[in-house]
Swiss-Prot record:
A GO molecular function held by the record: oxidoreductase activity, acting on iron-sulfur proteins as donors
Residues annotated to bind ATP: G12, I13, G14, K15, S16, T17, K41, N182, R183
Family according to the record: Belongs to the NifH/BchL/ChlL family.
Subunit structure: Homodimer. Protochlorophyllide reductase is composed of three subunits; BchL, BchN and BchB.
Catalytic activity line of the entry: chlorophyllide a + oxidized 2[4Fe-4S]-[ferredoxin] + 2 ADP + 2 phosphate = protochlorophyllide a + reduced 2[4Fe-4S]-[ferredoxin] + 2 ATP + 2 H2O
Record-listed Mg(2+) binding positions: S16
PROSITE patterns, A to Z: NIFH_FRXC_1, NIFH_FRXC_2, NIFH_FRXC_3
HAMAP family according to UniProt: ChlL_BchL
The protein's name: Light-independent protochlorophyllide reductase iron-sulfur ATP-binding protein
Function: Component of the dark-operative protochlorophyllide reductase (DPOR) that uses Mg-ATP and reduced ferredoxin to reduce ring D of protochlorophyllide (Pchlide) to form chlorophyllide a (Chlide). This reaction is light-independent. The L component serves as a unique electron donor to the NB-component of the complex, and binds Mg-ATP.
GO annotation (BP), single: photosynthesis, dark reaction
Amino acid sequence: MSLILAVYGKGGIGKSTTTANISAALALQGAKVLQIGCDPKHDSTFPLTGTLQKTVIEALDEVDFHHEELEKEDIIETGFAGIDALEAGGPPAGSGCGGYVVGEAVKLLQELGLYDQYDVILFDVLGDVVCGGFSAPLNYADYAVIIATNDFDSIFAANRLCMAIQQKSVRYKVKLAGIVANRVDYVKGGGTNMLEQFSEKVGTKLLARVPYHELIRKSRFAGKTMFQMEDGPEKDECLKPYNEIAEFLLSENPSASVPVPIGDRDIFEIVGGWQ
């Protein structure tokens, strides 16, 4: 039985880079991993494979949506550390539903008998859109993980995601494993002060603190994970939080909870208190 994770966060804060590095850490700790990108940009798995791979929707379109004509190699590429990578893709701009696309990807994996062949499956989901469509991965997930930075917009998006997780938990098994603080800069960004206060208020925890580091940005543009970058103390500093997250997720009973979202005015109070 696979452990299924849904990773969310505000767009543009390094969510896919973080997800790919968590996948790499999980694989290097012995797990068989599948990462599913759920964004029309289909760049979630780029650090794992070094390519913008064909999406499930593109593959289905080539066979007039006859699922039975597709094989594993038509939709999955194997990347760093043996991680399997899949990009769901998305409908054309201005039409269709992202949730439908995610559903088609899961359906195809099940038809190919692949869905239960992994120790861990990670959905990397377009972050601050919590419509019914893009919240679809929460229907399948054991745990949700929120990626956030120490600023108002990111915390506002995280709170909206907590609302979605709370709603889904009524009918599904999903719980919030915690929040990953990304791009932590204690000089310019205040560290994690606001995120710590927000996490406490919604009833969750910070899983790890990923530093704001040029090396992480360079790895992304190179189509690599941090684990593939040149060895050195800076690399070790960057790898530490990813390994901590993987160890937590692979532990026997990872602690998780149903979050209790706060009001919008409460978020302003958190941010205002640190100005």
